[in-house]
């Protein structure tokens, strides 16, 4: 079987918001790829030895001084190159074509391009046919500048009414440019275009798949740690859970998982983690019940950022104490994933990205003197979930809504107290249970309950009560950068409210948060 890294695509990032999406689409096709800065050196490209190169989009203008350019070696490496949006423009300009600055006539949003010439990139692809019999493609545009003259050796492959060069190709050199974004779902045939590029034009094999990734990760863990022991902070979240399963498969009993119950988890979550990983999967777990330690440290603190720092510090202190008890451990495992290791760098434009050599997401002490094992550092979140399923983890755990690292510590507004956490846990469990029962859970991106430290008058039977208020929050979003509040049915919200107030002594009122992001954030703190 081929090594899963043998066939690969290099994506050069010029700062587009869609660049990581390109990488995810190539991975979904089954081909390994990496995302690098646009100003990468010739030596680095040669060492990586890609089967093809993609020049991604970006916010700069090719017509501006000091705007980013692809390394000249890209066009001399003898491999296919695909330029997307800005990538097409810089390809055209660098190879002798011309780009003009857009003046109020850019294309933003849906467009339909008409195919003008046959190309390997668009082979057997069409969404409709024009009156003249030419293929039409529904695409997503986002550009101001445009190519006004294509380089020598290129032909026009597609156009729109306002963009005469919506796609271009030099089939002999296997250079292609598209002014639209094939990586977004609005470009209906975008995935097939990227498949043509990666599989047919670059001739990559599609062996980047969950079973192969697991096999490769297990082999690399064994090679890295040998017979040494490894410790892992297991939270029950997606990343640490998948790391635990990979390490368990690779080294078995030489893995020790430290599970810290901070008293800020969801209802019965600690028991569920211990039962699944300890009883069901047979992992070696050290359970630390630290609820009182966290709550004592949080006492009297109401400021959100201060609460986060306290929770983080107490966790680090506890993990440090427990790890030192594992005297034979030589390695620390972490759930670092690929987006974690991409950070902005100070290039000429400030738009490049670099790969960190090390990303200690836990903020653990430097004097621990442990080697670092990061088996997920090549993977996007969706890939982590897929290999989690392959490893036997339950779907409902892997695809749960996001839960903040500080847990209920930032969903109890103001000072965190045990009473508040206990009430919030039960209210949140009712909300989530009802979402599942109504088949609404997977129709919203995130849903949770917030405890408000205010009392409100209520009526129960013949008596009045003066108890706490909770807010329900549900949002719909694609990327969590912006979000709309979810328009849940009124009868559903009424049912949730009635259950919370009737079943939980201590809550007298339930409200629903109808704030979008922006101006509000998704979490309240």
From Swiss-Prot:
Ordered alphabetically, the record's keywords are: ATP-binding, Glutamine amidotransferase, GMP biosynthesis, Ligase, Nucleotide-binding, Purine biosynthesis
Entry binding sites for ATP: 235-241
Please give the Gene3D superfamilies that the UniProt record associates with this protein.
3.30.300.10, 3.40.50.880, HUPs
Active-site annotation = 85, 181, 183
Q: Which pathway does this polypeptide act in?
A: Purine metabolism; GMP biosynthesis; GMP from XMP (L-Gln route): step 1/1
Domain Glutamine amidotransferase type-1 span(s) in chain numbering: 8-207
Top-tier EC class: ligase
UniProt keyword annotation of Zinc-finger present: no
Cellular compartments per GO CC: cytosol
Segments crossing the lipid bilayer: none
For this protein, the record's SUPFAM superfamilies field holds: Adenine nucleotide alpha hydrolases-like, Class I glutamine amidotransferase-like, GMP synthetase C-terminal dimerisation domain
Domain of life the protein comes from: Bacteria
Domain GMPS ATP-PPase, chain residue ranges per copy: 208-400
Reaction catalyzed: XMP + L-glutamine + ATP + H2O = GMP + L-glutamate + AMP + diphosphate + 2 H(+)
For whether the record's keyword set contains Transmembrane, the answer is: no
InterPro entries per record: Class_I_gatase-like, GATASE, GMP_synth_C, GMP_synth_GATase, GMP_synthase, GMPS_ATP_PPase_dom, NAD/GMP_synthase, Rossmann-like_a/b/a_fold
The EC number(s) attached to this protein equal 6.3.5.2
Subunit structure comment from the entry: Homodimer.
Role this protein plays: Catalyzes the synthesis of GMP from XMP.
Q: What is this protein called?
A: GMP synthase [glutamine-hydrolyzing]
């Amino acid at each position: 079987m081929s090594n899963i890294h043998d066939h690969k695509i290099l994506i050069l990032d010029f700062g587009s918001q869609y660049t990581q999406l390109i990488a995810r689409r190539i991975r979904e096709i089954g081909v390994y790829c990496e995302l690098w800065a646009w100003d990468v050196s010739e030596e680095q490209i040669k060492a990586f030895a890609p089967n093809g190169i993609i020049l991604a989009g970006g916010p700069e203008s090719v017509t501006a001084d000091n705007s980013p350019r692809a390394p000249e070696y890209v066009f001399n490496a003898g491999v296919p190159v695909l330029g997307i949006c800005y990538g097409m423009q810089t390809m055209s300009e660098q190879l002798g074509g011309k780009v003009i600055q857009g003046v109020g006539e850019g294309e933003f949003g849906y467009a339909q391009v008409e195919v003008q010439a046959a190309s390997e990139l668009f082979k057997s692809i069409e969404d409709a046919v024009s009156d003249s019999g030419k293929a039409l493609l529904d695409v997503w545009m986002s550009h101001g500048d445009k190519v006004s003259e294509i380089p020598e050796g290129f032909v026009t492959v597609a156009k729109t009414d306002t963009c005469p060069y919506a796609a271009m190709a030099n089939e002999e050199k296997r250079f292609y440019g598209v002014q639209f974004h094939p990586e977004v779902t609005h470009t209906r045939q975008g995935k097939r275009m990227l498949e043509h590029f990666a599989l047919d034009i670059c001739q990559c094999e599609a062996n980047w798949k969950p079973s192969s990734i697991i096999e490769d990760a297990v082999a690399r863990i064994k090679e890295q740690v040998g017979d040494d022991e490894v410790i892992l902070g297991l939270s029950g979240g997606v990343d640490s859970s998948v790391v635990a399963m990979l390490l368990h498969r690779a080294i078995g009993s030489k893995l020790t998982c430290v599970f810290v119950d901070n008293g800020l988890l969801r209802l019965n979550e600690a028991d569920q983690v211990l039962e699944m990983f300890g009883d069901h999967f047979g992992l070696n777990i050290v359970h630390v019940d630290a609820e009182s330690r966290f709550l004592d440290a949080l006492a009297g603190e109401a400021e959100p950022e201060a609460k986060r720092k306290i929770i983080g510090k107490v966790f680090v202190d506890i993990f440090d104490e427990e790890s030192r008890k594992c005297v034979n451990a030589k390695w620390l495992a972490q759930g670092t994933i690929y987006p974690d290791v991409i950070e902005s760098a100070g290039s000429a434009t400030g738009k490049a990205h670099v790969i960190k050599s090390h990303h200690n997401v836990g903020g653990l002490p430097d004097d621990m003197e442990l080697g670092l094992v990061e088996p997920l550092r090549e993977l996007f979140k969706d890939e982590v979930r897929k290999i989690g399923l392959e490893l036997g983890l339950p779907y409902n755990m892997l695809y749960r809504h996001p839960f903040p690292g500080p847990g209920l510590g930032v969903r109890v507004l103001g000072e965190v107290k045990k009473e508040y956490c206990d009430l919030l846990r039960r209210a949140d469990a009712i909300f989530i249970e009802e979402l599942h029962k109504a088949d609404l859970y997977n129709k919203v991106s995130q849903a949770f309950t917030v405890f408000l430290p205010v009392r409100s008058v209520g009526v129960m039977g013949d008596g009045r009560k003066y108890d706490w208020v909770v807010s329900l929050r549900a949002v719909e979003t694609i990327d969590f950068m912006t979000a709309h509040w979810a328009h849940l049915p009124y009868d559903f919200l009424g049912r949730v409210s009635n259950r919370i107030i009737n079943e939980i002594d201590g809550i007298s009122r339930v409200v629903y948060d109808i704030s979008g992001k922006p101006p509000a954030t998704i979490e309240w703190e």
